[in-house]
């Protein structure tokens, strides 16, 4: 079986083992957050955005990403690898995988397209299930990007954000009502995840991310395509629902 980066994957059955993480990192609602980002100066933030790939590929960040993927479980992607097979694979191929990422040679797999019927007749929600290796890499990316971009998001935004829930949004609405606001606008961005403009997204990300190795990697994931019924479908727009980095990119 081939992975997206051309390495043959052999199914192995070894008891789970994970190297110790040197320092415990902060988490908010189960999402990994680097304490070094919050409350830091612009100079420090610029340092991390300029050297972002190095922090993404740090052992402690990859270990935390593996733990999150393992905890979430979920089904496998197009290469057939299951979550419980990921650790044995990483033991054998981690250095080669990290090397390909550093050199910009890594090629993500297409996502596995799954369609979930909506309540509205004839409508479906399109999910894109990444391979386990791609899920790990996306999770590692998301863990580093989240604390950086959280500082830029609106305080009145609650969707797909760590430490924020529907109940928090309701409390904010109640607060506005008590402050005298009397109008509510209700709207739905139809097929939002499926129609995110790639060029605009890359432009927005590039304003903050100054590491020229990270933007191309994210772009590869956006353009990786999808497999459905044995056929390849290119992705010219949208971020696939089902990948760890998609909620952050959508926001």
For the regions a language model picked out, list residue spans one by one.
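Amphipathic alpha-helical interaction elements
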Residues: 54, 71, 75, 146, ...
